[in-house]
């Protein structure tokens, strides 16, 4: 049974996954030769990858400002959330940034530590742009399913204070987490 307090770790959460799910997750994260590991070793490999500061940087960069605020509110232990935050809680839970119970969530202590090391001025500048491209990509997928780059550029450049060229959009896109 998972202990639900601020001492909970990402390992504790991922240990609840079955081995096949962990192998698929690890593969999505770029890990290889996962079949040879026992479950605890596999959990640790995935945890190490998720807590890697570069991985944390790019995974966190797709989060909206609201999602980041919700995440950080859970740093000090179990925190309640509103119905309006349910979608954000779902996203953060799917990305394994948080652990959710019926009406509360908590951020694993090792995620808090890695997040605090990751969130700096460089991250915030990149996150502002990457989260916008992510939001636009999500919208274009819903509207068109497949979007040519010239149309995608028109969509992302709709904000007057934030302009992108094709190379930057592709660079940002190439860093989006494959598991999400």
Task: Set out the residue ranges of the language-model regions.
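Short, charged/polar micro-motifs that form catalytic or ligand-binding hotspots
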Residues: 12, 32, 61, 79-82, ...
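Charge-enriched amphipathic alpha-helical scaffolds
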Residues: 88-97, 159-180
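Short, amphipathic alpha-helical interaction segments positioned at domain boundaries
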Residues: 54-62, 110-143
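Core catalytic DNA strand-manipulation module of type IA topoisomerases
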Residues: 70-72, 135-138, 154-158
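DNA-recognition alpha helix
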Residues: 26-27, 151-160
């Amino acid at each position: 049974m998972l202990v639900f307090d601020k001492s909970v770790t990402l390992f504790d959460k991922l240990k609840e996954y079955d081995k096949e799910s962990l192998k698929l997750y690890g593969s999505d994260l770029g890990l290889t030769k996962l079949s040879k590991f026992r479950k605890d070793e596999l959990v640790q490999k995935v945890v190490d990858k998720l807590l890697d500061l570069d991985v944390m940087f790019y995974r966190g960069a797709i989060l909206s400002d609201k999602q980041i605020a919700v995440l950080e509110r859970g740093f000090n232990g179990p925190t309640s959330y509103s119905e309006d935050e349910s979608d954000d809680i779902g996203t953060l839970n799917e990305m394994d940034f948080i652990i959710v119970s019926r009406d509360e969530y908590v951020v694993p202590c090792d995620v808090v530590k890695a997040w605090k090391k990751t969130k700096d001025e460089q991250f915030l500048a990149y996150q502002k742009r990457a989260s916008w491209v992510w939001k636009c990509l999500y919208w274009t997928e819903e509207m068109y399913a497949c979007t040519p780059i010239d149309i995608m550029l028109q969509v992302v450049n709709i904000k007057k204070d934030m302009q992108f060229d094709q190379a930057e959009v592709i660079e940002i896109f190439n860093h989006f987490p494959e598991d999400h």
